[in-house]
Amino acid sequence: MPETSVSYAAPTSAGFDATVALPGSKSLTNRELVLSALASEPSELVDPLISRDTKLMIEALEKLGARFENSGDNLLVTPGTGSQDAKIDCGLAGTVMRFVPPVAALATGRIEFDGDAAARRRPMITTIDSLESLGVRVEYERKALPFAVVGTGKIPGGDLEIDASASSQFVSGLLLSAARFQSGLKLSHNGATLPSIPHIEMTLATLTGRGVSASQTAASSWRVEPGEIAGARVQIEPDLSNAGPFLAAALVTGGTVRIPNWPSETTQVGADFARLLGEMGAEVSLSQGTLTLTGTGTINGIDVDLSAAGELTPTIAAIAALASTPSRLTGIAHLRGHETDRIAALVAEINSLGGIATELEDGIAISPGNLSGGTWHSYEDHRMATAGAIIGLVIQGVVVDDIATTSKTLPDFVGMWEKMLGLR
């Protein structure tokens, strides 16, 4: 179950000068955890993220036979395949509910999946249909959590066509395990626009980094050859999506923040924050691996297609609510199936503080408004919670109703936030 709710009176700030060291990427950590559990030899993950989502992933993979051991800030992983029935808690982690079922099918036993109440509303039809098409037995009352995978220790693989328009995680979840399928996998997407393509590129990069033959064969098609997944020592990059609130804080307050170990090349969509916040008024530079962002006193609106980087939307929307010109954030219809319906939630919360936001078919329109304090609801969504904290830097009296939900990807968010602001 999720952490106990904790309300948070968001502190205001007139600017600051700080360096913020980010923990590891959730997206990379959970992909490397899956590959390490399926590998032919042990692995070591250097600086992985330890948060609710990654703990849920570790617990799930342990129940399927892998072993994990802490070594300082690193994590040692010994692969293994389970042969017992098990119950897996997905929490609200899309990566767990969509990446682990194929792994469960490669184990032997009846593996039950469930999660938080909100997780039962998240799209899962494609995962269940995919497994059934691959010959895996799945038990369910409806094609959503809870369900059970009956693993036989093998998946034939072959050709598979799916509709992944609700989430790129449906593609990544299959690709990550596909090298262990008897015939590998030829996967194609047939449906509406595929969101968050950089996340699929990240999945392919992690696979090839483990010696797997994995490639994109057409605009919406991928191929993974059968074979071993190598053990490896993998450095986990800082989580650039989690950089968003800290970068936004500098922009909206006129402060300066430095983020060390910012990669010059990455598959993380959070790298787009440097460009997007530059367009919204910040001065941004990257020198010797440190990204520096300074607010200029100007906050511009933005018209942007975020289809490839939808998870950045709550942060960009929070900045847009404080901007002096209108914004349009489009290409993000798939956010309706995230931790909550992020489009409806952002519109409701911005408007509740006196802002002017409207839902579009595939996004949000935000105009300058006269904001005031009030309760900002987080909807058990970590990025909604941090969006409220951003607005609270400028608007006095904002109370985030549940800051504890940030533990999903950033366990010490409040400590990092207040240290950045000079309050600790």
Write out the residue ranges for each language-model feature:
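Short, structured segments at the rim of ligand-binding sites
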Residues: 1-424
